Each structure stands twice: as C-alpha cells, then as structure tokens.
C-alpha cells in the first residue's frame, strides 16, 4: 500500500508516534517519505551485510526482523520482516518505536540526510489531524 501523505500522518498519530520519544509527527513523515515514499511494500537489499530493509520504515533484517535468510540476524523486534510490509502498519510502528527507544531517530540514515536540521513542517501542512 502506498499511503497518501495526510492519511499516513493521521495513521501514525492514531498509533501514538506524534511526539514519541520527542520525535514530532512531521519528522516521522519526513523519514518515511525518504525511506520508502510511504510504500509499505518497499524493500532494499544491502549487499555488504547481506541484509534487507523492509516496509514503510525500511526496517533492517540484520537487527530488527526475521526474513529467514539474513546471516547472523538478531530479530530485535521479534517480528517476521514480511509482517512489516502489511497494509496494516501496526507491527511496523511497534518495531519503529522499539528502534527509536534503543537507538534514537538517528538510526535512520534518511532522517539524518534529509530531515535533521530542516524545516519539516510541510510534511503535515494541510492535514486534518
């Protein structure tokens, strides 16, 4: 599923991400825009670690989810990577919360590259929240 921007903003707010660990809703929108273009089915393979990033938050199979093929995987969120690509993003959000609790928002490279230090208010502009 490819979310429309304001639809995703509303969904993330309902699931408790607005202000979670001090991260604003606009920052989560910026992160997901640059990680996956709001697409729950996004995947990206990382040849170096032989791991794959999954779903709207691009959660990595080396550390956070189990895809059954990543060497020495940790599965920190105790979730199948396939579950992070469901149209229902509850499990993906639960895992993203764990990542931000343990490592902070800087765990996401796209956030550091595209969102940190930028005015991200436009990501929620015009949305009825």
From Swiss-Prot:
GO terms for molecular function: lysozyme activity. It catalyses: Hydrolysis of (1->4)-beta-linkages between N-acetylmuramic acid and N-acetyl-D-glucosamine residues in a peptidoglycan and between N-acetyl-D-glucosamine residues in chitodextrins. SUPFAM superfamilies: Lysozyme-like. Disulfide bonds join 6-127, 30-115, 65-81, 77-95. Lysozyme C is capable of both hydrolysis and transglycosylation; it also shows a slight esterase activity. It acts rapidly on both peptide-substituted and unsubstituted peptidoglycan, and slowly on chitin oligosaccharides. The sequence of isozyme 1 is shown. Monomer. InterPro entries: Glyco_hydro_22, Glyco_hydro_22_CS, Glyco_hydro_22_lys, Lysozyme-like_dom_sf. The active site is at residues 35, 53. One of its GO terms (biological process) is defense response to Gram-negative bacterium. Its EC number is 3.2.1.17. Belongs to the glycosyl hydrolase 22 family. This is Lysozyme C-1/C-2. PROSITE patterns: GLYCOSYL_HYDROL_F22_1 (PS00128), GLYCOSYL_HYDROL_F22_2 (PS51348). The keyword Hydrolase applies. Keywords: Antimicrobial, Bacteriolytic enzyme, Digestion, Disulfide bond, Glycosidase, Hydrolase. PANTHER family: LYSOZYME C. It comes from Axis axis. It holds the Pfam family Lys. Lysozymes have primarily a bacteriolytic function; those in tissues and body fluids are associated with the monocyte-macrophage system and enhance the activity of immunoagents.
């Amino acid at each position: 599923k490819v979310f429309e921007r304001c639809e995703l903003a509303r969904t993330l707010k309902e699931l408790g991400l607005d202000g979670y660990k001090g991260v604003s809703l606009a920052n989560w929108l910026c992160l997901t825009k640059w990680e996956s273009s709001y697409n729950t089915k996004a995947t990206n393979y990382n040849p170096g670690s032989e791991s794959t990033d999954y779903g709207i938050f691009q959660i990595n199979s080396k550390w956070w989810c189990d895809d059954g093929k990543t060497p020495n995987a940790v599965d920190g969120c105790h979730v199948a990577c396939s579950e992070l690509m469901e149209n229902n993003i509850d499990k993906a959000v639960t895992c993203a919360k764990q990542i931000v609790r343990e490592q902070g928002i800087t765990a996401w490279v796209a956030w550091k590259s595209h969102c940190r230090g930028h005015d991200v208010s436009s990501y929620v502009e015009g949305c009825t929240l």
